[in-house]
């Protein structure tokens, strides 16, 4: 049961640890110090480890509505409902157990955890943390849709059952407390108040030791004494933000709840684009409801991939070759296209129809062939004209040199001979 899962905390206690910003921009020893923030989940969920213990009352008994924290040298409890997690805005807390919180948070540049103590004072810790989760899939949506498509993703499983991952617990350090010392007529009085006090004075007699009752160090001053509360009946997390105890060996362990697991996430499906097919190209009209990824690539030896985030109505023209092209719009499945060898004209029709047919299939070769044939025709025409002029001249020259000669009618017609003048 869940209560049994919390039994591992019976031998532990919360603690106060160093926090650089306790919510007001100043350093303090916070009862809700942030130890670690984990963001391995692809669905954007965070797992946060803090110094307070959630789901336990002051005595260490499982109580879902409580959290316990260290106030000075004593453990106190408060309401779990006062627990808050923030980035740029409030986070949604999905689960808590002991030192751990799992929550979904909006993007932000910091993370803050706070609660109200037994006296209704806000206790907090704030750390610099860049939270900008990548979207699941290819669409940057804000609200998970009712309908869409399920994609594989990872998330923190909301279970408090034991796992293979653990955190180390060790003996708490002695906590210095100058308020335990008071000056009385040249003597230093140590007020135990029911606690075990370790003291060390550099002056006077019987000046080093431990005591659980009030004690006076004669002929001494407060500045010459050091007093600390020592309590080793419980363990606490081995934190880098807490002074280490004299006994540094691991004393116990607590399992880390909410393991990372493979799940599916529902994501939106972008509206299908309007498609217009052209000659070796396709025109897409895109209507995104939110920033949506558009990408395409060639299916040939060189894919030349291209992608962009589209956040407003856009029109894109992509080339389609015989080797094929593939485009994908948002979370829709990819679409593959190939250019078909279609053309106009007729392969066995009139010359202009033949040229039109082959131009559609092989434009460069057709232009070269037509240009070559046209050039040959022009050269042939020029040569023919030259030969005809030469033949005419040779045919008419004898008659031109003979006085009174008459050009025969047939030759005159073939050589376009001028009429004779009287």
UniProtKB/Swiss-Prot annotation:
Record's miscellaneous remark: Structural polyprotein: Translated from a subgenomic RNA synthesized during togavirus replication.
Sequence ranges on the Cytoplasmic membrane side: 383-422
Chain residues carrying a lipid of type S-palmitoyl cysteine: 385, 395, 416
GO molecular function, one term: RNA binding
Start and end residues of each stretch annotated as Transient transmembrane before p62-6K protein processing: 395-415
Extracellular side: 1-359
Protein name in UniProt: Structural polyprotein
Keyword RNA-binding: yes
Keyword vocabulary terms for this entry: Capsid protein, Glycoprotein, Host cell membrane, Host membrane, Host-virus interaction, Lipoprotein, Membrane, Palmitate, RNA-binding, T=4 icosahedral capsid protein, Transmembrane, Transmembrane helix, Viral attachment to host cell, Virion, Virus entry into host cell
The protein's role, per its UniProt record: Spike glycoprotein E2: Plays a role in viral attachment to target host cell, by binding to the cell receptor. Synthesized as a p62 precursor which is processed by furin at the cell membrane just before virion budding, giving rise to E2-E1 heterodimer. The p62-E1 heterodimer is stable, whereas E2-E1 is unstable and dissociate at low pH. p62 is processed at the last step, presumably to avoid E1 fusion activation before its final export to cell surface.
Domain of life: Viruses
TM segment ranges: 360-382
Pfam families: Alpha_E2_glycop
Species whose genome carries this gene: Ross river virus (strain 213970) (RRV)
One of the GO biological process terms: virion attachment to host cell
Chain positions carrying an annotated carbohydrate: 200, 262
Keyword Zinc belongs to the record: no
Entry GO CC: host cell plasma membrane; membrane; T=4 icosahedral viral capsid; virion membrane
Note on domains (UniProt): Structural polyprotein: As soon as the capsid protein has been autocleaved, an internal uncleaved signal peptide directs the remaining polyprotein to the endoplasmic reticulum.
InterPro entries reported for this sequence: Alpha_E2_glycop, Alphavir_E2_A, Alphavir_E2_B, Alphavir_E2_C
């Amino acid at each position: 049961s869940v209560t049994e899962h919390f039994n591992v905390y019976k031998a532990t206690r919360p603690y106060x640890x160093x926090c650089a910003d306790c919510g007001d921009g100043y350093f303090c020893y916070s009862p809700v110090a942030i130890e670690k923030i984990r963001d391995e989940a692809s669905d954007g969920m965070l797992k946060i480890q803090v110094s307070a213990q959630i789901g336990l009352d002051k005595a260490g008994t499982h109580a879902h509505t409580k959290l316990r924290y260290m106030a000075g040298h004593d453990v106190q409890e408060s309401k779990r409902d006062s627990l808050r997690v923030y980035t740029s805005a409030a986070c949604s807390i999905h689960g808590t157990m002991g030192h751990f919180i799992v929550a979904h948070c909006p993007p932000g540049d910091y993370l803050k955890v706070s609660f109200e103590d037994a006296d209704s004072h806000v206790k907090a810790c704030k750390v610099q943390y860049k939270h900008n989760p990548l979207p699941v899939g290819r669409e940057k949506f804000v609200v998970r849709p009712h309908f869409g498509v399920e994609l594989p993703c990872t998330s923190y499983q909301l279970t408090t059952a034991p796992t293979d991952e653990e955190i180390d617990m060790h003996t708490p350090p002695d906590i210095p407390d100058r308020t335990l010392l008071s000056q009385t007529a040249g003597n230093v009085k140590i007020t135990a108040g029911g606690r075990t006090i370790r003291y060390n004075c550099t002056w006077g007699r019987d000046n080093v030791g431990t005591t659980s009752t009030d004690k006076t160090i004669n002929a001494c001053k407060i500045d010459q004494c050091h007093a600390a509360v020592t309590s080793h009946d419980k363990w606490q997390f081995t934190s880098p933000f807490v002074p280490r105890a004299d006994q540094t060996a691991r004393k116990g362990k607590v399992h880390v709840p909410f393991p990372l697991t493979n799940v599916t996430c529902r994501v939106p499906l972008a509206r299908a684009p309007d498609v217009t097919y052209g000659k070796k190209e396709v025109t897409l009209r895109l209507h995104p409801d939110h920033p949506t990824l558009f990408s395409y690539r060639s299916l040939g030896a060189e894919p030349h991939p291209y992608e962009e985030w589209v956040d407003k109505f856009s029109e894109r023209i992509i080339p389609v070759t015989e080797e094929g092209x593939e485009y994908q719009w948002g979370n829709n499945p990819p679409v593959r296209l190939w250019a078909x060898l279609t053309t106009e004209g007729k392969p066995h029709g009139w010359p202009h129809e033949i040229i039109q047919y082959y131009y559609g299939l092989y434009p460069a070769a057709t232009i070269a062939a037509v240009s070559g044939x046209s050039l040959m025709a022009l050269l042939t025409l020029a040569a023919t004209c030259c030969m005809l002029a030469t033949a005419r001249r040779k045919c008419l020259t004898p008659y031109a040199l003979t006085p009174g000669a008459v050009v025969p009618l047939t030759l005159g017609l073939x050589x376009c001979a001028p009429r004779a003048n009287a």
